[in-house]
Amino acid sequence: MRNFTFKGLFLEVVFIVLGSLSIQAADGDLITKQITIKLEEAGTLPSKIGDTKKYKITNLKIMGEINGTDLCFIREMAGSDREGWRTEGKLATLDLSGAKIVRGGGIYYNSVNCYTSDDVIGNYAFSGCCSLTSLILPSNVTSIGYSAFYGCIRLTSLTLPSSVTSIGSSAFEGCRSLTS
């Protein structure tokens, strides 16, 4: 039988507590460096990033074709799911300059059954994505839909390509931080 001293027992408890704290901190760490994802096929972003990193990435660049499935996943990463409910997403900076929006995939916003169309930022595409602070749109986007960025309260910078010829009503409603 071992003899325990108060000092020895105290040190064991301290090591156990500190060990569990560092494990918890590692699980909650954010990924702040830019992550670049090259999609060979639309609809594959969820499998490229996975659920373990989905809510930890804060800076993302996507190259390749993206569809409704990808946009739904991006929305979740940026703070809003397809129902418009808040998520744990922390995505602040999104660079889509090397991406192309294409038709297909699943619904990205359920309330009004929104699907993607070629070269269009659709209705409600980023609505409620309250983690987004900076967004660069694809260079070939021609249209921005109704309420596309509605309620993006932290969005400060949005890069629109010169190819945009129409912007829907209320597209930027509630974007109170937008400065450029």
Locate predicted features:
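Structural signature of tandem-repeat unit edges
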Residues: 32-40, 58-66, 89-119, 130-143, ...
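Extracellular beta-strand-rich solenoid/capping regions of secreted or surface-exposed proteins
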Residues: 71-86, 106-128
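Bacterial N-terminal signal peptides that target proteins for export
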Residues: 1-11
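Short, T/G/N/S-enriched strand-turn elements that build extracellular solenoid repeat scaffolds
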Residues: 43-53, 69-79
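Boundary at the C-terminal end of the N-terminal hydrophobic targeting segment
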Residues: 23-28
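Bacterial N-terminal signal peptides
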Residues: 9-20
